[in-house]
Amino acid sequence: MPTVDDILEQVGESGWFQKQAFLILCLLSAAFAPICVGIVFLGFTPDHHCQSPGVAELSQRCGWSPAEELNYTVPGLGPAGEAFLGQCRRYEVDWNQSALSCVDPLASLATNRSHLPLGPCQDGWVYDTPGSSIVTEFNLVCADSWKLDLFQSCLNAGFLFGSLGVGYFADRFGRKLCLLGTVLVNAVSGVLMAFSPNYMSMLLFRLLQGLVSKGNWMAGYTLITEFVGSGSRRTVAIMYQMAFTVGLVALTGLAYALPHWRWLQLAVSLPTFLFLLYYWCVPESPRWLLSQKRNTEAIKIMDHIAQKNGKLPPADLKMLSLEEDVTEKLSPSFADLFRTPRLRKRTFILMYLWFTDSVLYQGLILHMGATSGNLYLDFLYSALVEIPGAFIALITIDRVGRIYPMAMSNLLAGAACLVMIFISPDLHWLNIIIMCVGRMGITIAIQMICLVNAELYPTFVRNLGVMVCSSLCDIGGIITPFIVFRLREVWQALPLILFAVLGLLAAGVTLLLPETKGVALPETMKDAENLGRKAKPKENTIYLKVQTSEPSGT
């Protein structure tokens, strides 16, 4: 009986239907980018200092310049690493004293300014920015700076818990229903976040968005990879992820045009309501329908694909089914990912790779945001470098395979982080170049692990397998903001050292996975178990006997 891949070879693996579905679903990938890394602009922290109403009043009376007013409000920045005093402390002075002069009011209070008492910024901060961010609106600086880390960690926590539920939902009730449900919740929560009256409500809507947005992205990814044959799967998988890069570039332009975070949030959220139109544009996955014994519906969709591609349905289409496996369970469960020793080993390796790739990818972005000279240009450069990374992945996957390029890309990312440790912060241009090299390497690794992860699991548990393994990427995303911002306070190079170790180790364990180049998607547990397994010597012997016996009988 023919499989889905057999039928696709006859009706078209990458025909008009697949191209149309690909372009439509790529919009989901592009829309996911502002959610995933939007913190760079939504949570931008500009230069700031304490606000002092007393100094402002005296400045107005004395006609001071802004620089003079700042000089009498906060202590100087001093050596590197002591900027905290200027941003989070101010002079505790009674500015209503009549003895204060306009020339040097602090001189009459102390001969040395270091003897003046310092206090917290009780009256807020003054931010040096023409726009606004969640940092400037909710004062997420100084003692509350960790709340910005929590904002991004909360999103990744939503990714983590949502991945398991959405993945199970997609395998149990279908890819299409999962896609539409997550689109609706994601759009509504994104708009509500733009109208958040306080930090806690904003955090709640961000968590809700995290619970569904990654599942929405993965549902689209799974659909497009299941619509095409094995010959086109590698291309559409990487191009789908390249659409994420297009979303990053578009985000840069939107952030530059809309410097106020609420307008930016609305601009990236409102258009996602249009994805509900996919109800009429995208069919259910025939592979999933077959795994649920809904053969009639799967045959109908395959017939639709044939018509869209201008092909006649093959004569054996009505015999379409999955290969029989008496041990197969149609209802996916977490235990299926660990049922055999081979699957168990692969699952653990994939989990570590997802964790490492997430920490390095988000870590490099946040590190760039914390050390950037021009935030918009630096973000744009680091986003554009993902495009050649995608083409490198396409070329190497076609000619070399998945495993060796993925190992080399992790090695490149880890080595880049190691090199950045020894580059002076004053050489900003060199830091950006090395960071872009590392960003390209980790981008290639992420593109490939998405492809490899989907290729190592059978159909009935594929979506759950991708979701569970990629949940380690969310754990990495939860801790990455704290790694970047909190460890930098201990030692600026400490996050980069950790990134380098993780990347170099990931390069080694990648080599333990089987190659999947040119191999059809496994449809049963037996297919998945046999990936990378060589033929037994006994089978080879029988084959040789058959070949040698034929000539003697003629």
From Swiss-Prot:
The modification Phosphothreonine is found at T541. The lineage of its organism: Eukaryota, Metazoa, Chordata, Craniata, Vertebrata. One of its GO terms (cellular component) is apical plasma membrane. Electrogenic voltage-dependent transporter that mediates the transport of a variety of organic cations such as endogenous bioactive amines, cationic drugs and xenobiotics. Functions as a pH- and Na(+)-independent, bidirectional transporter. Cation cellular uptake or release is driven by the electrochemical potential (i.e. membrane potential and concentration gradient) and substrate selectivity. Hydrophobicity is a major requirement for recognition in polyvalent substrates and inhibitors. Gene3D superfamilies: MFS general substrate transporter like domains. GO terms for molecular function: (R)-carnitine transmembrane transporter activity; acetylcholine transmembrane transporter activity; dopamine:sodium symporter activity; identical protein binding; monoamine transmembrane transporter activity; neurotransmitter transmembrane transporter activity; norepinephrine:sodium symporter activity; organic anion transmembrane transporter activity. Residues 1-21, 171-176, 230-235, 284-347, 398-402, 453-464, 514-554 are cytoplasmic. Phosphorylation of the transporter leads to changes in its substrate affinity, resulting in a regulation of the transport activity. In contrast with rat ortholog, ASP uptake is inhibited by protein kinase A (PKA) and C (PKC) activation. ASP uptake is also endogenously activated by calmodulin, the calmodulin-dependent kinase II and LCK tyrosine kinase. Inhibited by cGMP, most likely through a cGMP-binding protein that interacts with OCT1. PANTHER family: SOLUTE CARRIER FAMILY 22 MEMBER (PTHR24064). NCBIfam families: 2A0119 (TIGR00898). Optimum pH is 8.5 for the transport of MPP. While optimum pH is 6.0 for the transport of the drug quinidine, no transport activity is observed at pH 7.5, possibly due to the protonation of quininide at pH6.0. Optimum temperature is 22 degrees Celsius for the transport of TEA. Doesn't show any transport activity of TEA at 4 degrees Celsius. It comes from Homo sapiens. A motif (Proline-rich sequence) lies at residues 283-287. Belongs to the major facilitator (TC 2.A.1) superfamily. Organic cation transporter (TC 2.A.1.19) family. Widely expressed with high level in liver. In liver, expressed around the central vein. Expressed in kidney. Expressed in small intestine enterocytes. Localized to peritubular myoid cells, Leydig cells and moderately to the basal membrane of Sertoli cells in testes. Expressed in tracheal and bronchial ciliated epithelium in the respiratory tract. Also expressed in skeletal muscle, stomach, spleen, heart, placentacolon, brain, granulycytes and lympohocytes. The modification Phosphoserine is found at S333. Pfam families: Sugar_tr. Residues 43-149, 198-206, 257-262, 369-376, 424-431, 486-492 are extracellular. Induction: In the liver activated by HNF4A and suppressed by bile acids via NR0B2. Increased by cholesterol treatment in hepatocyte cells. A large substrate binding region with partially overlapping binding domains for structurally different substrates is formed by several transmembrane helix domains (TMH) including TMH 2, 4, 10 and 11, and it is alternatingly exposed to the extracellular or intracellular side during substrate transport. Amino acids in TMH 1 confer major functional differences between human and mouse orthologs. Contains one proline-rich sequence (Pro-Glu-Ser-Pro-Arg) that is required for transport activity. Phosphorylated. Involved in the uptake of clinically used drugs including diabetes treatment medicine metformin, neurotoxins 1-methyl-4-phenylpyridinium (MPP(+)) and iobenguane and platinum-based drug cisplatin. Also involved in metformin efflux transport. Metformin competitively inhibits OCT1-mediated thiamine uptake, leading to a decrease in hepatic steatosis. Plays a role in the anticancer activity of cisplatin and may contribute to antitumor specificity. The chain crosses the membrane at residues 22-42, 150-170, 177-197, 207-229, 236-256, 263-283, 348-368, 377-397, 403-423, 432-452, 465-485, 493-513. GO terms for biological process: acetylcholine transport; cellular detoxification; dopamine transport; dopamine uptake; epinephrine transport; establishment or maintenance of transmembrane electrochemical gradient; metanephric proximal tubule development; monoamine transport. Changing M408V: Does not affect transporter activity; no changes in MPP(+) uptake. This is Solute carrier family 22 member 1.
